[in-house]
Structure formats: structure tokens, C-alpha cells
Amino acid sequence: MPASKKISDRNHLGQVFDKLLNQIGESEEFELPEWLNKGKPTPYIFIRRNIYLTKKVKRRVEDDGIFCSCSSSSPGSSSTVCGSNCHCGMLFSSCSSSCKCGSECNNKPFQQRHVKKMKLIQTEKCGSGIVAEEEIEAGEFIIEYVGEVIDDKTCEERLWKMKHRGETNFYLCEITRDMVIDATHKGNKSRYINHSCNPNTQMQKWIIDGETRIGIFATRGIKKGEHLTYDYQFVQFGADQDCHCGAVGCRRKLGVKPSKPKIASDEAFNLVAHELAQTLPKVHQNGLVNRHIDAGKSWNNLSQRDTCSRNCIGVVIRLSRPTSDRCFGLVRHFDEYSRKHSVMFEDGVTEFVDMSREDWEIV
């Protein structure tokens, strides 16, 4: 291109730029809008179901998984339709399509439960938050925690990138040993539920047709306008974060709860008996009806210990196993010789568990 042509073009662009400056007027200091200074909710793409960026588990076929003894409530029948006492439900596993209750089956979480009404708000100290827009009863399903399902390697890479950017809001929830739900970029309102050391909801891990999904359920009655919270049990990544939940007994820092101390075998039996006495007013097992066990009682003979072991049958327990996918189990049998309980887990596998060596609790 001739030099004269280049100069002509530059002069023309300069004239256009000068004209724009005259139209703009005097320069002013740039300030962010007030709504940005107060804290804008982090942008994300709304989704209804998890999006898998890793290999998705195969769907369960009709004959896979665990089964319950419930059956359809036909006229004149004393059978019970799947409900709170369904073995599948007690193990946080949905019934399969081969359930004898058919269309009457009530153990179809997520599929049959409607998301509760809730509203996104800005809090004074905790950024964005969620309040209930309707009354919620204890035990009711509130919302599913959804996002991108990634593996541990991808999770670690994303965490380091966020750390280098100085971000402090994490939306990660581990569902299995090598599978994490990341709601940073895609999710729903559940990502805005804040932490509390005394929460009114909890996360529950359910197996739906072979897929592990996370639901948020009310642990007590929640009033309209009340903040929804759950215990993050946050695994620290970087500097400590202060807790501003304001609950009685606040731990002051976001972090994992201290684990329960390991207890001796006899004490483990006593603890089971104590919790059973509070949660199971009547025991129907092997003909034993309303046979209570006193808390703190010393087990001096095998018959007394056997009574406790029989009363444990049918109880759902939660085991703290960071490196295992098997956390929830149904106690099915007690072996007096080995002093171990036979526990069936949500994937249908049965193990003999020494409860004196496990960190556990009754669900």
C-alpha cells in the first residue's frame, strides 16, 4: 500500500476519534454500580438435572439393587405400601420398577416430590442466601443439589484455578469416591443455601436407578421467610473462613465436625440401646413387644446382650467412611461369636461390621 494512502487512513481515523471525544464530553472517574459493590450473586446456568462430564454409571436394571417386602394395599389385605418403613427407603435407595407396590409405591424420591418454593436474597454477612417461601414440614424434600459431575482430577484442577483467582465461594459436593458435583457454573438455587452450625436441613445421598443423587431435606419444621441452611462440614482449602451463622454453639470456623471418639464394645451396645429407647418406643422383633432397654445398663450375661442385638435388627445406621462409598446400612443380624453386626448397604452388599471400631450413628 502506498505511504500516502496509509497516512490518509490514519488521518481519517484520527478525525473520527476526535469527533467521538467531543460527543462524550469531559472524562469522569469510573465507579462500579452500587449493586455490584454490595455483592452480586455469582452467575450460573440453571439446570434441573446433573450434567455428567465424567463417565456416568450404568442405569440399574429391574433385578438389580435391594428389595423390600412391601406390597400393594389391595382390599382386605394387611400388607403395607412402601413408606417410611420400606427397607429400600431406609437405605436411601429408591424402589425399582419391579416393586410389588406398583404405582402406589411412595418410595420414589426426586421423581414424585415437588421442589419447595424459595427465594434468593442478599444477607448482611453471608452473601447470597435462600429463604423459604412456604411452610415446610420436617422430613420433606426441598430441592435436589445439581451441577456438573466431575472426577477428582478435574475437581483438583478447578480448585487450584479458583484459588489462583482469589475466589472463596466453592460449590462442590462429593457424592462418591471419584465423583463430585460442581455447581459453580451450572446448578439451581440449592447452590445458594448457606451454612449453619445448627441447620434446619440436611443433605441426603440417594440411589435412584443406580445413579447417586443428592437431595436436601428438612430436619425440622421451617416457617415461611426462614433461612434455609445446612452444615457444610467444609473441608478446608486455603485460609480459614469465619462462620457468621450466629447459631447457639457456633464453631466460629467453617470446618469438618470433630469425629466421634472410638468407644469400647460394651459401651457401643449401651449407646445403641439408649438411642433405641428414645427412637423406637415399641419393638416388634421375635415376639418382643414394648421391651425397653435401660440406658447405661451393664451387660452382664449373654441373654441381656442378645436382647440388645435383637433390638438392633432393622435399625438404619450411618457410618463415617471417607474412603468408601458405603455409608448407610440396615442392621440385619448380630453374630455373638464375632460380636459383629451384619449390615446391608445401599448397594445391596452385606458386611460384618464391628461397631466398636466404627464412627457411626443411628439415622
From Swiss-Prot:
EC numbers on record: 2.1.1.-
Pfam families named in the record: SET
GO-annotated cellular components: chromosome, centromeric region; endoplasmic reticulum; nucleus; plasmodesma
Reactions it catalyzes: L-lysyl-[histone] + S-adenosyl-L-methionine = N(6)-methyl-L-lysyl-[histone] + S-adenosyl-L-homocysteine + H(+)
UniProt domain AWS: residue ranges: 63-114
Residue span, SET domain: 116-233
UniProt entry tagged with the keyword Transferase: yes
Protein name as it appears in the record: Histone-lysine N-methyltransferase ASHH3
Annotated organism of origin: Arabidopsis thaliana (Mouse-ear cress)
Lineage of the species this protein comes from: Eukaryota, Viridiplantae, Streptophyta, Embryophyta, Tracheophyta
